[in-house]
Amino acid sequence: MAFVSCFHLRLLFLCLALFMAAECRPDELNKKVDSDETISDDDVSARVQPNGGKIMIVRDNDYDASDDNDNDNDDDDNNDNDNDNDDDNDVDRDNDNDDDDFDDSNDDMLSFELDSIEEKDSDGNDVGSTEGHSVESFEDRPFSLSSVDRNSNALGVAAINVNLSTKLEDSNADVDIMLYLFREDGTISFGNETFDVQAGTVKFNIKISNWDFCDGSAQDCSEAKAGEYLDVNIKFKSKDTPIEVTDEERKSQNKPAVCKDKDTPDTDSDPDDSSDNANDGDDDDDDDCPHIYNMGGDSEMLLNRGVMNGDTYTAMPFGFPKVEIEDGEKKIKFRVPKFDDNVNIDPSVTPGRVPKNASPSPALCLKIHILFIALLQAVTLFINSW
């Protein structure tokens, strides 16, 4: 009997060890504690990685609204109470499957990261290889993280905000990424573009400052060309290859419009509206609508047609921004016209809702498979011992 008890104890420890081995991946063991920052509201979470500036976005379709009944008064989780109902920034305590959600094997996760910056001349050709006029890769580039502001807003719409920033040593330029997770539905404007966002939409404003463009001399750039554009490239992950859709196509699928319909009578006192005909098929006062992309899995992405050059809205050249596949990777290419002090690019994305009966992620299936094999081997050993 003692032998059986000892064997059972050893078997228990063996199963526990095997389960922990399956649960803890080497990359997680080597990961620096608190190196990433995760912000959450309702069923949407966004995680940012300071090493490379990667942004990952997921929607928790098993979300329980009761988790939002947080009775503590902490704003930044510095004084977290283990007994509170929820802690929006305490990922490990509130979301047991969070790491699985943010695993690259999760087909429903959306991710975005800066890939490169290339200076171009007026014809779209490289200006040359002189240092300071391109960034070949942002991989492993360190970004500093701001504190999380849960009471922020973007253009009047309540949001949670966290910022990333890095300095480009060769050019002495600065790159800032301002991430906003909207907490409510609303309407925002970006220059000449006005569009709706939802609670759960994530907007990440990319700001480039103090870029020194080539002046056309051989001393400044090897090809003696003047810089007129910056190609800002973002690589991303989505369930499917994005397909551009129109608001009319979306409405046929019973989705709410992203942009205001043309010829909808305005409610302001703008005299330009006085002669507007709601049936004329034209309305000069309507703002532009961003490009709308279906990313698969019910997720959508909005890409603005222009950028903000300081306080001035400037349209990108025809054909930009564009989505392309390069070396097997999905990329967004923004062609930014030359600017003086700073420029802002402002994409946004709304993660889709995965059906409740969706299959478990490959990462979870792998863990279950490993655990099943381990238990099967343990049972075999137990039977053979008798």
From Swiss-Prot:
Protein's UniProt keywords contain Plastid: no
N-terminal signal peptide: 1-24
Main subcellular location: secreted
Keywords on record: Secreted, Signal
Subcellular location: Secreted
Segments of skewed composition (Acidic residues): 63-107, 266-288
Tissue specificity comment: Component of the acid-insoluble and acid-soluble organic matrix of the aragonitic skeleton (at protein level).
Keyword presence, NAD: no
Protein name according to UniProt: Skeletal aspartic acid-rich protein 1
Source organism per UniProt: Acropora millepora
